[in-house]
C-alpha cells in the first residue's frame, strides 16, 4: 500500500481523532499508530512532522483527502481506524460513532471491528 505525505497526514488526523474520541489516550493506541507509520518507511525525523501536521489538519480537509483515495486505500484506512479503536480492549460508543461517521463521509467500506483487526494483521 502506498500513500503520499499529504495522505499520511490526513490518516494521522483521523487516527488522532479516534484515539481522543473516548477522552483518554492509551499507550496501545499510540503504539499502533507509530508502528503503521514506520511500516511505510517514514524516517523517524519525518514522523514528528506528519504527526504534528495531522493534529493541526482541519477534519474537513482530512476527510476530503481520504474520500478521494482508491478503494484499497480506503479499505486500509477503515481497518486502521477500527484497529486503533479496538487495540486497548475497550470499544467506546464515541469511538464507534466516529468510525461510522468517518466511514460514511469518506466512503470507506463497511466492516466489523473483527474484520478490521484481521485485515491489519494480514497486512503487517
Give short role names for the model-derived ranges.
Residues 1-124:
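Small-residue-enriched hydrophobic alpha-helices in membranes
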Amino acid at each position: 500500500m502506498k500513500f503520499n505525505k499529504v495522505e499520511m497526514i490526513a490518516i494521522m488526523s483521523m487516527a488522532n481523532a479516534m484515539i481522543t474520541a473516548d477522552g483518554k489516550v492509551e499507550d496501545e493506541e499510540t503504539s499502533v499508530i507509530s508502528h503503521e507509520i514506520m511500516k511505510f518507511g517514514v524516517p523517524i525525523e519525518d514522523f514528528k512532522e506528519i504527526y504534528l501536521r495531522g493534529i493541526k489538519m482541519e477534519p474537513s480537509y482530512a476527510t476530503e483527502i481520504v474520500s478521494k483515495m482508491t478503494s484499497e486505500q480506503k479499505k486500509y484506512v477503515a481497518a486502521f481506524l477500527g484497529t486503533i479503536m479496538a487495540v486497548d480492549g475497550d470499544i467506546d460508543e464515541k469511538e464507534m460513532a466516529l468510525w461510522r461517521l468517518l466511514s460514511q463521509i469518506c466512503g470507506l467500506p463497511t466492516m466489523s471491528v473483527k474484520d478490521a483487526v484481521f485485515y491489519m494483521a494480514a497486512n503487517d
